[in-house]
């Protein structure tokens, strides 16, 4: 009987992190080092459960949770040159930097109270989600851990040679950097 109650779909909550804006504040050297925020990522957490419904969120599009992950150890760094069509080449037009293998963490973000939880998404159960989750929670009360994170960056090998059309040239070649 206890197992049926514990494993009931009424007790399960699915939480999905959703982006709600464009990442900002990218710092290349922070991505290659340690203990400095690499970028700012605005997100919200979408909670789903038969009782709280499908419109329950922690954070909103207008007031998101802002994550600022930072490397906890120095990542391994590698560079790969390739042509505009993606073929590896020592003298290619593009270079892709990979910073991999470091754990990343953020303990600085605040988390607002829940919204839209309950029947019809009207928020009748916001209080219950907040009570169970300890929300709202100030900066320093939350943590995000990313194990063996990877950060990638692609750029023109010699941006000066494409001047004054670096942006146009990069936009023609960017697809070759994707793997």
Segments from the language model and where they lie:
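Extracytosolic secretory-pathway proteins
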Residues: 1-179
């Amino acid at each position: 009987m206890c197992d049926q109650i514990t494993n009931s779909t009424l007790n399960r909550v699915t939480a999905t992190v959703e982006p709600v804006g464009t990442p900002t504040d990218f710092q290349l050297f922070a991505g290659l080092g340690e203990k400095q925020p690499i970028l700012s990522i605005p997100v919200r957490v979408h909670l789903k459960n038969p009782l709280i419904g499908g419109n329950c969120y922690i954070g909103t599009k207008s007031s998101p949770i802002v994550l600022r992950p930072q490397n906890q150890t120095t990542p391994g760094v590698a560079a790969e040159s390739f042509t505009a069509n993606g073929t590896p080449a020592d003298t290619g037009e593009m270079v892709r930097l990979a910073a991999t293998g470091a754990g990343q963490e953020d303990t600085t973000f605040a988390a607002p109270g829940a919204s839209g939880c309950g029947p019809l998404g009207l928020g009748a159960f916001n209080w219950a989600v907040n009570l169970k989750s300890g929300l709202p929670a100030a900066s320093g009360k939350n943590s995000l851990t990313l194990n063996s994170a990877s950060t990638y960056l692609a750029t023109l090998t010699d941006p000066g040679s494409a001047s004054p059309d670096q942006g146009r040239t990069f936009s023609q070649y960017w697809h070759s950097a994707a793997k």
